[in-house]
């Protein structure tokens, strides 16, 4: 009985390795800091249709991301939100590094509607003006030195 249990545990190890090698569906490309990846995924000063805008994100992940929100503002403006009062992150109560925007910004919400093959992801676009909540962290050496604290995660749209 014991050898069988031991063998079954050993058999799970390669599977666990495959799962971790695959990575999270939201894993950032290693060449980017968390703030740089935040900017690629969520900052778009001028609205583009989602099908076009999502190509840049999908090419890094080699898959069609199910949904995404683009804030039509500047990275510097979102950095300024990091200076607002800390709050518990609405979508992750264990984190206390979130900040409410305090002002509404124009944004585009993209939702995957078409084929899920990387060569032809199709999205619907919904435009709105909303508040947002971002998680912020101390900058990575790859981030602009003028920003000691930078946004790394778009937690909620309100």
Curated annotation (Swiss-Prot):
Region forming the signal peptide: 1-27
GO CC annotation, single: lysosome
Keywords for this protein: Endonuclease, Glycoprotein, Hydrolase, Lyase, Lysosome, Nitration, Nuclease, Signal
Reaction equation(s) it catalyzes: an [RNA] containing cytidine + H2O = an [RNA]-3'-cytidine-3'-phosphate + a 5'-hydroxy-ribonucleotide-3'-[RNA]; an [RNA] containing uridine + H2O = an [RNA]-3'-uridine-3'-phosphate + a 5'-hydroxy-ribonucleotide-3'-[RNA]
Enzyme's top EC category: lyase
Annotated glycosylation sites: 86, 92, 111
SUPFAM superfamilies according to UniProt: RNase A-like
Pfam family, one: RnaseA
Keyword Membrane recorded: no
EC id: 4.6.1.18
Protein location: Lysosome; Cytoplasmic granule
Positions where 3'-nitrotyrosine occurs in the chain: 60
Binding site for substrate: 65-69
Function per UniProt: This is a non-secretory ribonuclease. It is a pyrimidine specific nuclease with a slight preference for U. Cytotoxin and helminthotoxin. Possesses a wide variety of biological activities.
Family the UniProt entry places it in: Belongs to the pancreatic ribonuclease family.
PANTHER family the UniProt entry points to: NON-SECRETORY RIBONUCLEASE, RIBONUCLEASE
Subunit description: Interacts with and forms a tight 1:1 complex with RNH1. Dimerization of two such complexes may occur.
Protein name from the UniProt record: Non-secretory ribonuclease
The species this protein was found in: Callithrix jacchus
């Amino acid at each position: 009985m014991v050898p069988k249990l031991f063998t079954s545990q050993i058999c799970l190890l390669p599977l666990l390795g495959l799962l971790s090698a695959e990575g999270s569906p939201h894993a950032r490309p290693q060449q980017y800091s968390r703030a740089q990846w935040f900017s690629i995924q969520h900052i778009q000063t001028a609205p583009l249709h989602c099908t076009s805008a999502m190509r840049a994100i999908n090419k890094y992940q080699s898959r069609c991301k199910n949904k995404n929100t683009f804030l039509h503002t500047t990275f510097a403006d979102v950095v300024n939100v990091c200076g607002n009062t800390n709050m518990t992150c609405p979508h992750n109560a264990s984190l206390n590094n979130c900040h409410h925007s305090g002002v509404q910004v124009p944004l585009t919400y993209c939702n995957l509607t078409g084929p899920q093959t990387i060569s032809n992801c199709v999205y619907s676009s919904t435009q709105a003006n909303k508040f947002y909540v971002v998680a912020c962290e101390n900058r990575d050496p790859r981030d602009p030195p003028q920003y000691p604290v930078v946004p790394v995660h778009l937690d909620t749209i309100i």
